[in-house]
Regions:
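Alpha-helical transmembrane segments in inner-membrane proteins
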Residues: 1-341
Length: 341
């Protein structure tokens, strides 16, 4: 009952937050006006006819940005919950394990090579390639005789992350000033200027990858029992790890291609809900999806209203919130006595 109430509350809070976020900007729109425009956009007739300016602001400027926050936040939180479940480690997340660094290398390659200027589809595609290469390296380094050491996965993730960040710096070294400034702006993580075309390609890939994660809820719960117990219950542990790692890499890359490398969402949100509603992934993944979406919508809204007319990029907000929490987790693990799985 408690889990259902948490999920219902998160869903309602997300809807309210999205309506408020769509209404706030240089031109303030009341919530009723926003709802009216959205209903008419769905083909439903309402009593009041919105102006063409209100319709354009809601449907073509603010709604894509808010939906981008929902998609990016929800996806990163789901991926974080899955990684924490697979590796039985509260510090596991796509950015900590190096998958985000691989996606970033693919993205900066698209920017530096000029492919991004030829079309918005090149950045997400190269981000996926980079994330898959990072995931493959991590799995190959940490595997021995068909088995994967959970401790070595984390260590390999840190090593691969450092390698890819170094390659990013090397690419920037040979780029012109415009490309460097463009990438630095992108690395802060932000949703400014997001339009429907930026969501067109990533969304189908995201849906497939996230669906794969939801189809493995039972396996994620079995990982909590330990790999030997999972083997004895008939689960193909290594094959399941590979599937989940690929799905996480694709979903993370697509999310990063939309909002940049927004950090700590995949670490902070699922860990909080694991404490709140327990480790059962049948409820943890939906709660993490809604919680991550709500968290990023509110962070983006906060960045817009703190010092108007200037905006603080959402990646800065999440870093300011997530970094202290990450340090708290590290200190708590040390005090409890960290034991490698």
């Amino acid at each position: 009952m408690r889990k259902a109430l948490v999920i219902v509350f998160l869903g309602m809070a997300l809807i309210v937050s999205c309506v408020v976020a769509v209404g706030i900007g240089a031109v303030r729109l009341p919530p009723l006006t926003v709802v009216n425009v959205l209903l008419r956009g769905l083909g439903l007739q309402t009593g009041q006819t919105p102006s063409s300016q209100e319709t354009a602001v809601v449907l073509y400027i603010r709604l894509p940005r808010v939906l981008a926050a929902v998609i990016v936040g929800g996806t990163l939180a789901i991926c974080g919950a899955a990684m924490q479940g697979v590796f039985r480690n509260p510090l596991a997340s796509p950015d900590v394990l190096g998958i985000s660094a691989g996606a970033s290398l693919g993205a900066v390659t698209a920017i530096a090579s000029g492919l991004f200027a030829l079309g918005v589809y090149f950045l997400p595609l190269l981000a996926v390639v980079g994330a898959l290469i990072a995931a493959t390296l991590i799995y190959a380094i940490s595997s021995f005789r068909g088995r994967t050491s959970l401790l070595f996965v984390v260590l390999a993730g840190l090593a691969v992350s450092s390698l890819f960040n170094g390659l990013v710096s090397a690419v920037l070294l040979f780029s012109n000033n415009y490309e460097v400034s463009q990438f630095i702006f992108w690395t802060m993580g932000g949703l400014e200027g997001r339009m429907w075309k930026h969501l067109a390609l990533p969304l189908p890939f995201l849906l497939v990858a996230v669906a794969l994660l939801f189809l493995h809820l039972r396996e994620l719960n079995l990982f909590a029992l330990g790999e030997e117990s999972a083997y004895s219950l008939g689960m193909h542990v290594e094959r399941t790890k590979r599937i989940l790692l690929v799905a996480t890499a694709v979903a993370t890359a697509m999310a990063i291609s939309v909002g940049g490398p927004v950090g700590f969402v995949g670490l902070l949100v699922p860990h909080l809900f694991r404490l709140l509603i327990g480790p059962d992934h049948r409820s943890l993944l939906p709660a993490s999806a809604l919680g991550g979406a709500l968290f990023l919508v509110l962070c983006d809204l906060l960045g817009r209203v703190v010092i108007p007319p200037f905006e603080i990029r959402v990646g800065i907000i999440t870093a300011l919130i997530g970094s202290p929490y990450f340090l708290f987790l590290v200190v708590r693990s040390q005090r409890k006595g960290f034991r490698a799985p």
